[in-house]
């Protein structure tokens, strides 16, 4: 596929092609501004591609309504989104026939159930400006919401830089749980977390410049290897 933003002349993605199998983990890596979110925007049909096709189970997303495409995906983004309403309402979010047992099971699965039970009204606690949640707690709630939606495809933004180490481990564990049995697209910031990805797309200046798994890309000793080694050195230091 090829994609150019409206009002510009140079394609930000040019002649890119890949096939993703059900249940695979795809990591999208690159420096800030490399175009990682462009891939997400195209998958979600926020923009139409210039040439080529994006298909889900053989069906061209160009022939699908945007809402139908969105139904196929669960998203957990760096900027967590919660609305004014009870915790239960935030977890169920627009879904029908979700039981209390399912809500509690999802919260337990991601490790946020205990925190919810410590609140004065538990799952009926109304979230507004008077309730202060940490970044990590918000992230875990949105992961529980995604688990409840149970969509076959996932988009995860892995950024956890604004939380402490213990919370980061909780979030990573919850994300791993969420990815089980689902096809996942992970916007990776810490490369150490995506070494087990089935496919890594390496982006720079809007282009996909390398692709392969971790071992293949390290053996190629290119941009990804430099990125990984520099980050690993920083983490060790």
Specify the residue positions occupied by each region the protein language model found.
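ABC-type nucleotide-binding domain
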Residues: 1-237
């Amino acid at each position: 596929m090829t994609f150019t933003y409206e009002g510009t002349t140079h394609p930000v993605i040019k002649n890119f092609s890949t096939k993703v199998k059900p249940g695979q983990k795809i990591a999208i890596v690159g420096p800030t501004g490399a175009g990682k979110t462009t891939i997400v925007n195209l998958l979600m049909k926020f923009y139409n591609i210039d040439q080529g096709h994006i298909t889900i189970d053989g069906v061209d997303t160009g022939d699908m309504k945007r809402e139908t495409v969105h139904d196929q995906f669960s998203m957990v983004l760096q900027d967590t989104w919660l609305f004014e309403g009870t915790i239960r309402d935030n977890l169920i979010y627009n879904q029908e026939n979700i039981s209390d047992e399912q809500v509690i099971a999802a919260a337990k699965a991601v490790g946020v159930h205990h925190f919810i039970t410590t609140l004065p009204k538990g799952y009926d606690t109304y979230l507004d400006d008077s309730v202060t949640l940490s970044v990590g707690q918000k992230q875990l709630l949105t992961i529980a919401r995604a688990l409840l939606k149970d969509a076959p495809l996932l988009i995860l933004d892995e950024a956890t830089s604004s939380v402490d180490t213990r919370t980061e481990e909780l979030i990573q564990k919850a994300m791993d749980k969420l990815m089980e049995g689902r096809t996942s697209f992970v916007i990776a910031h810490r490369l150490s977390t995506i070494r087990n990805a089935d496919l890594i797309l390496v982006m720079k200046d809007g282009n996909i410049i390398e692709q392969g798994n971790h071992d293949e890309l390290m053996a190629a000793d290119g941009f990804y290897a430099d990125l990984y080694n520099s980050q690993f050195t920083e983490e060790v230091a």
